[in-house]
Regions:
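N-terminal signal peptide c-region/cleavage motif recognized by signal peptidases
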Residues: 21-23
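Extracellular beta-sheet repeat scaffolds used for adhesion and glycan interaction
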Residues: 126-156
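Intrinsically disordered, low-complexity peptide-like regions
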Residues: 2, 19, 96, 104-105, ...
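N-terminal small/polar-rich segments of proteins
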Residues: 25-113, 149-189
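Extracellular/luminal beta-rich ligand-recognition
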Residues: 107-138
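Bacterial N-terminal signal peptides that target proteins for export
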Residues: 1-11
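Hydrophobic helical h-region of N-terminal Sec-dependent signal peptides
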Residues: 10-19
Length: 189
């Protein structure tokens, strides 16, 4: 092979190898955008609520003119901007029964009329911690003279909610080991 032919062949092979490794030139391009989305739902969660144990009620001396107070707490955690409304069930209501309180605990024999009246109050109402109003707001489901409670939700941090109760003084009730009532707390949001 002549020397010029070798040079020409070498240059041709080199050119082919050089352009073979080069990216192909695009004839055009296309783009497409997309959105990343998510929805934040209103969610509220309550912790377990401990029993509201008033303790011993003495209608003869200690509680003859002063009610027996008690409270229990729970935490409420909601997404920011949720609008929770807390209500308490009204299982054993005392309305129209000429009793001292709005609610009633029984001693296991409700048919005999053995009830111990008590009240539960909306936080910050008369009788409750941090009271700011002139009349009590009885905590219930918004019916029968009761109110619900709508706490504000400034952020996702848990809030402690206090359920404050009073057993009114001087009730004429029979001796019993325990009086009780079952109350259900509900949060709607």
């Amino acid at each position: 092979m002549p020397r010029n032919s070798v040079k020409l062949l070498t240059a041709a092979v080199f050119a082919v190898l050089l352009f073979a490794n080069a990216p192909a030139r695009a004839a055009g391009s296309a783009t497409q955008s997309f959105n990343a989305t998510a929805r934040v739902d209103a969610v509220c969660v309550m912790s377990t609520i401990g029993d509201l144990a008033f303790g011993s009620y003495d209608p003869v001396s200690a509680n003859a003119s002063t009610g027996l107070a008690g409270n229990t707490t729970f935490t409420l955690t909601c997404t920011r901007g949720a609008s929770p409304v807390l209500s308490l069930s009204l299982a054993n209501l005392n309305f129209g029964q000429n009793r001292a309180g709005k609610r009633a605990m029984n001693n296991g024999t409700p048919a005999a009329g053995n009830f111990l009246s008590y009240d539960l109050f909306v936080p910050n109402s008369v009788g409750g911690p941090g009271a700011t109003s002139a009349s009590p707001a009885y905590w219930g489901d918004g019916t029968s003279g009761t109110s619900t409670f709508a706490p504000s939700v400034p952020n996702i941090n848990a809030q402690t909610i206090t359920i404050f109760g009073i057993v009114p003084p001087g009730q004429d009730v029979p001796v019993a080991i325990n009086y009780s009532d079952s109350v259900t707390a509900t949060v709607n949001f």
